[in-house]
């Protein structure tokens, strides 16, 4: 498995808009993307925006990076500067991986 993590400073008053953008634009744009396991975003305890996507492998992430960049381009006006991107191999607890993707996404959608 592979993860891409993005941290960004958000312009004052734009955090809710940034989270709504991910919920309403970014997540739906990835529906049906091969190798994508999930996308999520949150506000951190220090006021930064954090988003992550999990992939079956690095190749799946690389195959959709252009679409990812296009989807995030609309959020640029909400950000204060360039986001910090980190990525690499990850491990996952078997408990979460046993749930169907649809069930996990319904849970995450309800949390916004």
Q: What spans do the regions from the language model cover?
A:
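Short S/T/G/P-rich N-terminal loop/turn motif that feeds into the first structured element of a domain
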Residues: 1-50, 56-70, 76-112
């Amino acid at each position: 498995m592979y993860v891409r993590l993005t941290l960004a400073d958000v312009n004052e008053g734009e955090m809710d808009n940034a989270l709504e953008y991910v919920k309403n634009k970014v997540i739906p744009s990835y529906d049906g993307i091969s190798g994508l396991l999930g996308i999520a975003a949150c506000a951190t305890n220090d006021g930064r925006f954090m988003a992550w996507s999990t992939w079956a492998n690095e190749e799946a992430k690389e195959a959709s990076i252009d679409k990812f960049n296009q989807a995030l381009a609309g959020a640029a006006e909400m950000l204060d500067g360039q986001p910090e991107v980190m990525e690499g191999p990850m491990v996952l607890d078997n408990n979460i991986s046993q749930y169907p993707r649809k069930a996990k996404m319904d849970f995450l959608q309800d949390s916004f």
